[in-house]
Structure formats: C-alpha cells, structure tokens
Amino acid sequence: MTLDRTSGEPLPAQLAGQVRSLVLSGTLATGDRLPSSRALAADLGVSRAVTEQAYDQLAAEGWLEARRGSGTYVTTTRPSGVTSRPTEPTPRPTRVTSRPAQPTSRLDTGTPFFDPRLEPGWRRAWREVSVAAPPRGYDDPRGLAELREALAARLGRTRGLDLHPDEIIVTAGTTDGLRALLPELRPGPVAVEDPGYRAAAETVLTYGREVIDLPAVETVRDLGAAVAAYVTPAHQHPLGRVMPAADRLSLLEAARRADAVVIEDDYDSEFRYDVAPVPAMATLDRGRVVYLGTAAKSVVPTLRLGWLVAPPDLHELILRRRTITHAGAAWPSQRALLTLLRDGWLDKAVRSARRVYAERAPRVAEAMTPYATLAGPLAGMYSTWLLPEPDARCARDAARAAGFEVNLLSTYARSTGLTGLVIGFGGVTDAELDQALTALTGALAC
C-alpha cells in the first residue's frame, strides 16, 4: 500500500480505501490479521494517528475487528457476485474557462420576473424568520394557521373563492398538491390536457395511473373512465388559452356524469393585462373541483409553496395521510410568505410583474407575428406560437447558439400534432429578450 501526500484526500481515508479494495478483491479474507497500527505506520512513513484513524473507521464500518491482546482482523469477505474492483470515482469537473456548452438564459414558462426594487422587503421577511422561535414538535399538517388566514383573504379577493382558513392545506407547490391528491382518488385513469403540463402527466404515471389525453383546444363533453381531469383553465399551459365559461360548465357536467373530480391548476391566473383575471373554476362547483395554487409565479419557484382546496371528503383523506407522514411545506418558507402577504409585498410583486409582462408580450408578438400564429391571448409570462416543426427547431437551434433556451411546443404534446415555440419572457432582461428575438426571427426569415 502507498499513500499520496499530494492528493487532496486525507491520508486516513486513502488508507481505509485501499484496505477496502483489498477485501473486495479477495486479497484479504475473513480472519486475516493486519499489521499493528504502529508497524503499518512505520512501513508507510506516516504517524500512528493515520493508521489508527483508518483502522477505527474500517472497524466502525464492519470491515475490521480489533481483538484485545491479539491484533486487528478482517471480519468481512467479499460476497459472491460483488465486483472485485470498486467502482471508479466520478472524475471531478475541471474549471470551465470557455463559453458554456448550454444556453446561459432560459426563455421558459416557469421563471417569473423579480423586481430588484422589492429586494429589501424580501430580505426583511427572511430576517423576521431568522429571529422567530420555531415551532416545537411537528406543526399543523394543514400549514401555519396565520398563513392560511392570509391566503383565504387573498384568494377571496383575487380569485373569487369564499374560503374558511381550515379548508386550505399549504403544500410545497402545485406538484406536491397533486401528489397529495392522487392516492386518495378511487382507482382509474386521470385525464390530463394535451398539450399540457408535463410534470402533471409524469406525476400521474409515477403513481401507477394511466394518463388519458384531454384535448386542450376542444370542448370536453365526456371523460370516459377517467376519475379526474387535470386542467389549467385560467391560462392553459402551454397554449395560453383561457377556458371559456361554456367549456368550464361542459367539463363540470362531464365530471358529474363520470363521478370524477376536476383538478384546477390555477397556473398564471393573476397575470392578465388585457382584462381582469377570470375567477377560479372552483367558484362554479366547490364539491367537484380540487383547487391547486402556487406562489412560484408570483414570488419565486424556489420558495416551494402552494395551496390545495379540496371537497370535504378528499380534504379529510389528504389531511389524514399528511398527519401520518408528517408531509408539509417548510416552516421557514411559510413564515416568510406570511410576512410578504401581511406587508403587501406580494401585491406589489404581482403588479410590478404584470406591468413588465404587459410591455414585453407585445414586443414578442411584433417580432413573431410575421412568421407564426399566436395560439392564445397575450397574457401571462409567455406566449405560444404555432409554426411547422422544422421551422421551430431551426429557430430553437439559432436561439441556443446565441445562448438562449426556448421550448418547442411539441415537447408538451403527447398525441396532438401541434408544433411551434413557447417563448417565456419573465426570467430575462429586456436586452436579453431582444437578443433572443433577433436570433429567433433571423432564423425564421431565412
């Protein structure tokens, strides 16, 4: 055995790793006696502390056994079927000095605008979290009572929902809310919009349920065997369509006939800048709709907070499971959001983002209209443009070469043939947006 003093790995760790390798290779077998720590240290030219630490570590892991007055022995032999050569460690990444291979900016649908003028309020909220006394034991599985009260007030004011705070369950985001709901539904497939939110379809599949494609641009009159339908009626993801009132009523009637629930993902609902936001679909039938909301688009995705409102029977089932599993949103994030709500910070953030989106959306439309067809109204933090797949890929590749990632509409589709580009404009600067549009339209103009 040899030790490398120039390596960044500590000497005891090197020695322990080499002994493990000798056992795994079969060179050392159960019952073999190792040199004393003093003798091995002398052979290797290191201090005795190095060999003692290595032996102690290997003994703690169950490879070696120290017998008083006798020495140190191997206690573990390589099981049959285990490779005699340990897995090679993954090479550490080297410092990158050239331009990254991947785009540096993302024009996606999930990154909102964050007004730097609001940073002081954001920091103040987290300072308050840092000095607040944490709860002793597990907190309420529904979430902080004060936060639920603030959310109930806000959802009543902005989404038309008349809620008691106890009807709200705070989650770690929309997908967490869906994960909480799926085990409580009766067996059967779940209908998900197509094209639609990819994470929703993948989550349904993860829970062992079949996904039925629900055409996002058609009126739904029959849900078939589906036990639930996942929709984004306020601003369909990714087409941007607002579900008309007649289509909402038709979907609810289809759900009643199928004894299914409608899962309303209230995605991007607050960012209408042409008309007032459409009230939540849950206002039409609280007994049939499971409402999912998130702070990811109005605050930041990394806050990892959302909320769920379900009919009473499902509410109790979800709450019971979350009580047993101690599932729930992180307490610091809940406290921070509570402060942001109480201080009026969230309202300011929404107004600021809405103004920015209202200015950027027409710029995107002006650039793209000569080459593509807008799929929905100008609303929210992205717009979707229909065009042939070869043209969309060519434009996407040009944007990548310029350092920007733009999503293809086809990546959201499962069975529909819709193709085009989904252009987000929340998470970039004005200058970056102009650069990206120049790259996109330059490719489309060829």
Listing of model-derived features with the role each one plays in the protein:
Residues 207, 284-285, 370, 402:
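Short, structured coil segments at secondary-structure junctions
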Residues 110-113, 174, 233-237, 297, ...:
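Short glycine-rich anion-binding loops that position phosphate/pyrophosphate groups of nucleotides
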Residues 69, 283-317, 328-332:
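Active-site PLP attachment segment
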